[in-house]
Curated annotation (Swiss-Prot):
The lineage of its organism: Eukaryota, Viridiplantae, Streptophyta, Embryophyta, Tracheophyta. It comes from the Eukaryota. GO terms for molecular function: DNA binding; DNA-binding transcription factor activity. This is AP2/ERF and B3 domain-containing protein Os05g0549800. Keywords: DNA-binding, Nucleus, Transcription, Transcription regulation. PANTHER family: AP2_ERF AND B3 DOMAIN-CONTAINING TRANSCRIPTION REPRESSOR RAV2, B3 DOMAIN-CONTAINING TRANSCRIPTION FACTOR ABI3. Residues 11-29, 178-187 have a biased composition (Low complexity). CDD domains: AP2 (cd00018), B3_DNA (cd10017). Pfam families: AP2, B3.
Amino acid sequence: MDSTSCLLDDASSGASTGKKAAAAAASKALQRVGSGASAVMDAAEPGAEADSGGERRGGGGGKLPSSKYKGVVPQPNGRWGAQIYERHQRVWLGTFTGEAEAARAYDVAAQRFRGRDAVTNFRPLAESDPEAAVELRFLASRSKAEVVDMLRKHTYLEELTQNKRAFAAISPPPPKHPASSPTSSSAAREHLFDKTVTPSDVGKLNRLVIPKQHAEKHFPLQLPPPTTTSSVAAAADAAAGGGDCKGVLLNFEDAAGKVWKFRYSYWNSSQSYVLTKGWSRFVKEKGLHAGDAVGFYRAAGKNAQLFIDCKVRAKPTTAAAAAAFLSAVAAAAAPPPAVKAIRLFGVDLLTAAAPELQDAGGAAMTKSKRAMDAMAESQAHVVFKKQCIELALT
């Protein structure tokens, strides 16, 4: 017997008004919880709550505390859920005991779904770190559905550990360099972020746009306060270029030890952080093109030296184009098909050789065609010969 029938029986048996009200409230509460659960139910994981509908209200009707992490939503049972959006569709990543654990699950999914430009709660994985590089390869070797399934089943760390062991077993040991010290500059660098340059970044604008989240985190600027209070005046000020931060000079050292100086500033008109002066010379010398990546690093020591590195995409070789060009030239320079001449009764009969096909099927068709042509030519020759004989006898 369900709760509704119990309430009806209680009401029919002459229960007090207070009991009726309590039973009705309990029935209403049960219906509300059931409705909220169905609204936030995920088909792939029954019982998972989303960030819409009833997820902001607990059993007593109060609001749940919001999370400070991206992609993390609180649950009425005190646990924390993680989710990510893919093509405007919510992908539920599972329910976790701790808020930080749910945030790490979101970071894993974000780096698989978004790639190197993913915005994460904690430090993103970098290829410069050997451990992180192994995890990046592990994520790249798994599909999005497989990563989501591992996160939901809480088996991601176990699968990652097994993959690291297998990778270490088949990888050769790194060469030993006694002269190198653990305090070398390359080992002490901290990877900040990578920026994939766009056509406008390497064009004639002479500027590189730094993503806002990375700029405010790693290269903060003291922006001037707004000088106007009117929205119309503020818009006019922005259109005129007012409010722009003059910026500072940042020194970056590349892999060859050369120091590059860039002017780093904030453009109020486009509300973007940019590297301007010195950037075009860097693009020209490094040969950057759209799609190449630029990495930014900082020394882990007290000097906080900045480093810059280029990751140029492999350009397609021209061997295939050269081979195609040579084949086209050879085809154009090929001699015309041979022409056979047959002299019959003082008349030259010209017959052109049929082109040969390369494949076996084409060869068979050509052979049959030749036979038909030979038969037709022989019949024509017989008729022509007969006419010539009759003409000679008359």
